[in-house]
Structures are given as structure tokens and as C-alpha cells.
């Protein structure tokens, strides 16, 4: 196990970001207080069964979410993580649960979308992934196999396996610092990342608007808006 102290500068960082980061840019959080996901029950729009049952509803829902990305901009937290990506000389992996493109637009490159991306599509006929057209409801042809009517959002729906898990697990085992930003601490497997990293000797830090369900697993917690906390923390790391 790695021997670390609080004052040590990290050599390998894994960062997990969730809906709280994008919420400050105006992206709706995953689920409202009424339990609905932008007016829909989750099982209506975010499961493979929903897509088989009513593909038009699902495609319209994601087309609207994709179009909404054009109305939002990266915030100070995205920009700070982009700066960290550019200037941090050690190992870095930013893992996001968010399906928007605000991290990319904020400058992040060492980035993995574990729940997929709104701006990507996947062909259910041949499996090819591609840039999503402006709308999927029109049933465009796959750019790889040219079959029509088989493109779905390249999003991890409930009951499906998150992307990049082997790479994420390896990074968590190597990390000497794990940071969780804007997450609920309730959705697995991401909610278990802190224990994996800690179990391999990493220091752990939570930055969240309010304490998450897993705050007690972290060595340190800072609570407040991500747009304030993250730039200050990045300055500490790079100083």
C-alpha cells in the first residue's frame, strides 16, 4: 500500500464528476424532487426495454437533450479541470457520469464518459459508434453499415454496463489521490470508487454542494458550489 500524507503532492489523480458540476451551467440534474427525469419516468426513456417499446419517445427525448446542449456553456469548474489536464505533469484521469460535452469544451482531454455521450450514437445492427446526427428520430443511416433505423443514443441505460470500467479500475488502483465532484454518492459502480482508491492507499477528497450519501468514506470533504471549490483546489495542486 502506498504511504501518503495529506501534504504530499499527488503523482496520479483520478477525478469523478457528476451532475452537480454541469448543474451550474444550467444542465438539468438527473432527477427532480418528484422523481421524474425531465417530466418522464426513468423506465419510459432510459432503459433498453423503453427503446424497444416506444423508440420514438426515447429518440425524441434524447434529441431534445442533445439540442439543449447548444444553450449551455462550460462553467468555472469545467475550465479549472481543463487547466489541470493541460498543466498537471502526472497521471490524470477524469471520469464523468455526465453525458454532456462541457468537459471537452472546458479543455479536458484525459477524459472518459462512463455513462456515454449525447453527441454520440451507436448502431444496434453493426455496433459501430459514430457522431450523432442532429436528430435520431428521422432514422438516419449508420455511417458504417448504412442500415437505416438502427441508431440509438450511445448512452448507458439502466441495466447496462458502464463504459471504460477496466481502465477506470486500473487508474483507481494506481491513484494516490481520488476526488469526487458533484456526485450523489448513491449510484453504483461510481459510488464505490472512493473505497477502491482508498483501499489501494489513495487520499480521498469530496467536493459537493452538500454532503453526499458517501461523505463519511472520504478523508476530506469541502462543501459549496463546484465553480468556486474546483478552481481553488486546482490552484493548490498546481502551485
Residue spans for each PLM region:
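Conserved catalytic core of sirtuin-type NAD+-dependent deacylases
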Residues: 1-239
Amino acid at each position: 500500500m502506498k504511504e501518503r500524507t495529506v501534504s504530499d503532492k499527488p503523482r496520479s489523480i483520478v477525478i469523478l464528476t457528476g451532475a452537480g458540476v454541469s448543474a451550474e451551467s444550467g444542465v438539468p440534474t438527473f432527477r427532480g424532487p418528484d422523481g421524474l427525469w425531465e417530466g418522464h419516468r426513468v423506465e419510459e426513456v432510459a432503459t433498453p426495454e423503453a427503446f424497444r417499446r416506444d423508440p420514438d419517445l426515447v429518440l425524441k427525448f434524447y434529441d431534445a437533450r442533445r439540442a439543449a446542449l447548444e444553450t449551455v456553456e462550460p462553467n468555472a469548474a469545467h475550465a479549472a479541470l481543463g487547466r489541470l489536464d493541460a498543466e498537471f505533469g502526472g497521471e490524470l484521469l477524469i471520469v464523468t457520469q455526465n453525458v454532456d460535452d462541457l468537459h471537452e469544451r472546458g479543455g479536458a482531454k484525459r477524459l472518459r464518459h462512463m455513462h456515454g455521450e449525447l453527441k454520440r450514437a451507436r448502431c444496434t445492427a453493426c455496433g459501430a459508434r459514430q457522431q450523432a446526427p442532429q436528430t435520431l428520430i428521422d432514422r438516419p443511416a449508420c455511417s458504417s453499415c448504412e442500415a437505416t433505423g438502427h441508431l440509438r443514443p450511445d448512452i448507458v441505460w439502466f441495466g447496462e454496463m458502464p463504459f471504460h470500467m477496466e481502465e477506470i479500475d486500473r487508474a483507481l488502483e494506481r491513484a494516490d489521490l481520488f476526488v469526487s465532484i458533484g456526485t450523489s454518492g448513491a449510484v453504483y459502480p461510481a459510488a464505490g470508487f472512493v473505497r477502491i482508491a482508498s483501499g489501494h492507499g489513495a487520499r480521498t477528497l469530496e467536493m459537493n454542494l452538500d454532503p453526499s450519501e458517501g461523505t463519511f468514506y472520504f478523508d476530506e470533504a469541502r462543501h459549496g458550489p463546484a465553480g468556486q471549490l474546483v478552481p481553488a483546489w486546482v490552484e493548490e495542486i498546481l502551485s
